[in-house]
Amino acid sequence: MIGDFICSSANDGTHYFRPVSARAEVFWKENNFTQKYVIDNTEDYYIVKSVNSEVICNAIREADMDFTS
């Protein structure tokens, strides 16, 4: 079973999030996370300050989604 998001830490005060399922993409957009929390992005990942990653992770879990590595 594949997860909905990839989340990793760069150990520089940021976390990288990547929606990998269609429902994760919709969830990310519906919750307006890009405008609320994203400080930068790469081709594949949204970069978020680590202090905000807990809010995002909790919202993902509350929506019955999960993470993959």
Predicted stretch roles:
Residues 9-12, 37-42:
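Short glycine-enriched loop/turn motifs at secondary-structure junctions
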Residues 24-36:
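Short aromatic-glycine-(Arg/Gly/Cys) micro-motifs in beta-strand/loop hairpins
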